[in-house]
Amino acid sequence: MKKQILMAGAAMLALSAGAQTAIPNSGGDNDEQGLIQTVFGIKEKTDKFHLYLNTQTNFNLNWSGEGGTDFDGGRFAFKQLRIEFKGQVNDWISYRYRQRLNKGQSELGYFDNILKSIDIAEVGFRYKKVNFVVGKQCAAYGGIEFDLNPIEVYQYCDMIDYMDNFMTGVRAAWDITPSQQLQFQILDGIALNPGEMYGENITKAKLPFLYTVNWNGNFNNIYSTRWSASFMNEVKNKHMWYFAFGNQFNFTPRCGAWLDVMYSREGIDRKGMITNVVGEQDGHNALNTEYFTLLLHMNYFVHPKWNLFGKVAWERNGVYKSTPDVVKGTYGIDWLYVGGVEYYPLKDRGLHFFLTYVGQRQGHTAKAQAYGLPSHSYTNLLTAGFIWQIPLF
């Protein structure tokens, strides 16, 4: 009994600690011994239960304004803090649960009756080459950066930052070969109350589902793909199409890159970025909006423990068809710049420390300026801290 109390106490203490990197496929399945195992000398670890604390802890200095030179201040923060446990019950049943500990809740409730702070609450069933997953899960969207553990990303591009990623439904994954996989997924497209997402003056869709087909490919560990096409019934008679093409390149064991191409065409503005410019139309979000993103990330390990990385994203947002209130055309051209250095003190490259610069330029065309926005604005961020997916057990 005393040992059980001590183990529970150690887990709670670990939850108050703080941290992993912008390198794909570091999902936590490593051989590092868990904190509870180390403290209590547990010799064997079972695949039926793995417990992690995903954290990104940092100190930030912020500048903003039209020139990006107005100092806004500094602060310490947990940018990401998630508890996660998962396991393999037997050869054909698995489970996974992950919840964000530093995310607020909606007072209006949730369409799928599950807290938005819960990323994943799923059960998987495998039969030969096919795996079926039921519950709240990550959308099977393409893109390399989208597939990363959120703690590994210093700043998302707007396309992903304004996207709903975790929804309830079913997914089937077919391993055609060990290096080629197809996924088919149906999710509740509405996570929050529909009125909160799109405005009150809408007619809800009777089947507001998100349908996605996804291809994950690997070619000799040199070139990998994560491509997808999605269709969603947003509200009655308004639909969304989303395409994402992720391409990862491993040039050498030390040098790699990925290129993500993303396009979203929304009958009613799901992301809300255009609505933030032009305002609501007849009590609902703007209509006929579109978003396009190109993202390039590169990294180079100058030493087994030292990594240099850089990322640039170019994004365009606009309206593809005029309405009586809003004219067709481009409203914004945005740039994102991220670069820095990481230090990995451990061989498994789980824990790492970082010093990172994040710069964002928001450009507004004449169409957006007609709504009172400046031609452009900048934000600059200098951040230092550490990232770690702490293996508690």
What feature does the model see in each segment?
Residues 2-11, 16-56:
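N-terminal periplasmic/intermembrane-space "pro-region" immediately following the signal or transit peptide
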Residues 22-29, 56-58, 62-71, 110-111, ...:
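Outer-membrane beta-barrel pore domains
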Residues 23-27, 36-51, 92-95, 126-129, ...:
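Short loop/turn motifs that connect adjacent beta-strands in outer-membrane beta-barrel proteins
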Residues 33, 37, 79-83, 116-123, ...:
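Hydrophobic, lipid-facing positions within transmembrane beta-strands of outer-membrane proteins
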Residues 40-61, 71-192, 217-219:
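Outer membrane beta-barrel
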Residues 145-147, 196, 271:
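Short aromatic-enriched loop/helix-cap "lid" or pocket-rim segments at secondary-structure transitions
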Residues 161, 204, 287:
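Glycine- and other small-residue-rich loops at beta-strand/loop junctions that grip anionic moieties
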Residues 185, 189-242:
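Loop-centered beta-sheet repeat module
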